[in-house]
């Protein structure tokens, strides 16, 4: 019997342009949740579960921000501090429109995981509150800060990318005009 091939854009890691990056991204995204949910089955040491979950969340934050975002959807962000004024602002980077074709499967996995994980942590915070397990709330709060930061940053980065692509095509008559449009849009989103 023949196996049906998945359609492009479906949630099958086999269709990914970067399967190792995608699987590592999904492993980081799910591992912190799994350790939080099932850690007590393997050890009674709450501190150990807390530390492992924090390390996995930090690894997820770093991997998503610096590797998975760039390889899967062509987006990257970082925070810069002006040394003179001390003002902080986010900087967004996206791949050039003609240089990278974003795989629909990679994009669906990326955006689904980016928005689903903070929602799951909110549910876990509510469960911790109603089950009166307040000891877990600091861990959930840290998880929410890290996952929501990445979600907001990548959402803004995607909006910046779309706006600069529109501005770039409108002013594509010359490289200077495209750079001016990109810088204007970048300044608008960095406020």
Curated annotation (Swiss-Prot):
Taxonomic classification: Eukaryota, Fungi, Dikarya, Ascomycota, Pezizomycotina
Family classification: Belongs to the TVP23 family.
Residues carrying sugar: 103
Membrane topology classification: Multi-pass membrane protein
Source organism superkingdom: Eukaryota
Biological role: Golgi membrane protein involved in vesicular trafficking.
Any Pfam family matching the protein: DUF846
Annotated TM spans: 20-40, 46-64, 109-129, 134-154
Protein name from the UniProt record: Golgi apparatus membrane protein tvp23
Organism: Neurospora crassa (strain ATCC 24698 / 74-OR23-1A / CBS 708.71 / DSM 1257 / FGSC 987)
Gene assigned in the entry: tvp23
PANTHER family (UniProt xref): GOLGI APPARATUS MEMBRANE PROTEIN TVP23 (PTHR13019:SF7)
Assigned GO CC terms: Golgi membrane
GO biological process: protein secretion; vesicle-mediated transport
UniProt keyword list: Glycoprotein, Golgi apparatus, Membrane, Transmembrane, Transmembrane helix
């Amino acid at each position: 019997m023949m196996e049906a091939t998945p359609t492009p854009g479906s949630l099958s890691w086999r269709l990914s342009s970067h399967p190792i990056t995608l699987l590592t991204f999904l492993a980081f995204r799910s591992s912190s949740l799994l350790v939080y949910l099932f850690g007590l089955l393997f050890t009674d040491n709450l501190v150990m579960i807390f530390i492992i979950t924090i390390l996995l969340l930090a690894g997820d934050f770093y991997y998503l921000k610096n590797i998975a975002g760039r390889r899967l959807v062509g987006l990257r962000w970082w925070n810069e501090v002006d040394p003179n004024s001390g003002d902080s602002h986010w900087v967004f980077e996206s791949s050039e429109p003609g240089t990278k074709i974003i795989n629909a499967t990679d994009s669906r996995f990326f955006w689904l995981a980016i928005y689903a994980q903070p929602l799951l942590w909110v549910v876990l915070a509510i469960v911790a509150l109603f089950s009166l397990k307040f000891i877990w709330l600091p861990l959930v709060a840290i998880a929410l800060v890290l996952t929501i930061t990445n979600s907001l940053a990548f959402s803004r980065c995607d909006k910046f990318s779309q706006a600069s692509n529109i501005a770039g095509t409108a002013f594509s008559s010359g490289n200077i005009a495209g750079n001016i449009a990109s810088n204007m849009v970048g300044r608008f989103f960095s406020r």
